[in-house]
C-alpha cells in the first residue's frame, strides 16, 4: 500500500455516502425502483473514485490521469440526458403530468449530484493527505452536511401564503373564490366537481413571487405533487375533470383546482407548502428594477 491508500479510501467512502444520501427518493423523485438506483449508485462510485485520486495524481505529477475528468463530465451530461428522456417518456402516461420544467429540474439535479460527490471525495482526500486521517474524516463529515444543505432548496411556503378556496359555479364557469378556472357545461360534471373537488388560493408575498408562480411549469409542478400524494379523481379522456391552476391577472394570486381521491385538506396544504420552487421558474424582476432606479 502507498501513502495515499487510506486517504483515497476515506475520500471514496465520504463521496459515496454523500451520493447515497442525495439519492433518497420520495413521491416526486425518480428513480423509485432498484434498477434505476443501481445506475446512479455505480455512477456515484465512479465520481467518488475520480474525485479521490485527483490530489494524489497531482502530487505524483501524473497529469494524464486528470484528463479522465473530461470523460467523467461527458458521462454525467449523458446522465442528465438519460433522466430527461426517461421522464419525458413516462410523463405522457401520467394522469397529471410533471411538465417539462419539473423534468429539467430533476435532470439537472441528478447531474449536479455527481459533481458534488467528486468535490466531497476531493476535499476529504486532500485534507487526509495534507493534515491527517482524523482531520480528513472531520472535513468529510462537514462536506456531507454541505451536500445536505445544497439539497434543501426553496419551497412554495417561502414565497406564497396558502389558504382554502371555495369552489363555485357561475353559470357554466368554475371559480375558486373569484378566480375563473374553466367552463363546465354538463350538470353532472358540475355535480362531480363540487362533490370531489378542492380549491386553494396562493397569495404571493411579493412581486418576485407573483412572477415565479405565474410560470406554467411551476403551476404544473404544484398540480403534479398534489395529485401524486392525494390521488386524482379522473381517467384518460376526461378533459372536464382536469386539475388546473389559473391566475388572477389583477394581483397575481393563483387559484388551484384539484380533484383528489383522498379528501384531506390538511395534507393538501402540507403538500402545497413543500412543493419545490423550480430553478427555471424563478424570476427576480425587482432586482433589475432596483438597478435601473439607482
Predicted features, each with a name:
Residues 1-61:
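Membrane-anchoring hydrophobic segments
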Residues 16-21, 69-81, 140-151:
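Alpha-helical transmembrane segments and their membrane-interface exit regions
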Residues 3-12, 58-76, 136-141:
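Alpha-helical transmembrane segments
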Residues 82-95, 153-165:
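A cytosolic-side transmembrane-helix exit/cap motif
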Amino acid at each position: 500500500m502507498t501513502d495515499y491508500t487510506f486517504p483515497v479510501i476515506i475520500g471514496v467512502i465520504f463521496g459515496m455516502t454523500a451520493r447515497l444520501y442525495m439519492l433518497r427518493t420520495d413521491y416526486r423523485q425518480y428513480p423509485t425502483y432498484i434498477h434505476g438506483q443501481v445506475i446512479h449508485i455505480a455512477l456515484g462510485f465512479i465520481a467518488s473514485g475520480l474525485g479521490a485520486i485527483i490530489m494524489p495524481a497531482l502530487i505524483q505529477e501524473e497529469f494524464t490521469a486528470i484528463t479522465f475528468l473530461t470523460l467523467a463530465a461527458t458521462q454525467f451530461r449523458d446522465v442528465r440526458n438519460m433522466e430527461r428522456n426517461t421522464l419525458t417518456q413516462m410523463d405522457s402516461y401520467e394522469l397529471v403530468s410533471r411538465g417539462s420544467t419539473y423534468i429539467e429540474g430533476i435532470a439537472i439535479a441528478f447531474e449536479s449530484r455527481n459533481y458534488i460527490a467528486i468535490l466531497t471525495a476531493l476535499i476529504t482526500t486532500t485534507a487526509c493527505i495534507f493534515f491527517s486521517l482524523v482531520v480528513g474524516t472531520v472535513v468529510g463529515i462537514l462536506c456531507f452536511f454541505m451536500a445536505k444543505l445544497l439539497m434543501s432548496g426553496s419551497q412554495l411556503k417561502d414565497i406564497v401564503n396558502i389558504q382554502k378556496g371555495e369552489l363555485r359555479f357561475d353559470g357554466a364557469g368554475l371559480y375558486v373564490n373569484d378566480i375563473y378556472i374553466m367552463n363546465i357545461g354538463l350538470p353532472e360534471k358540475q355535480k362531480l366537481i363540487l362533490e370531489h373537488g378542492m380549491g386553494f388560493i396562493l397569495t404571493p408575498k411579493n412581486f418576485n413571487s407573483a412572477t415565479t408562480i405565474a410560470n406554467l411549469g411551476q403551476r404544473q409542478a404544484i398540480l403534479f405533487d398534489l395529485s401524486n400524494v392525494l390521488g386524482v379523481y379522473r381517467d384518460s379522456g376526461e378533459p372536464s375533470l382536469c386539475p388546473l391552476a389559473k391566475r388572477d391577472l389583477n394581483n397575481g394570486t393563483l387559484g388551484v383546482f384539484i380533484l383528489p381521491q383522498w379528501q384531506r385538506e390538511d395534507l393538501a396544504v402540507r403538500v402545497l407548502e413543500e412543493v419545490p420552487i423550480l430553478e427555471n421558474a424563478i424570476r427576480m424582476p425587482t432586482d433589475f428594477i432596483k438597478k435601473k432606479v439607482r
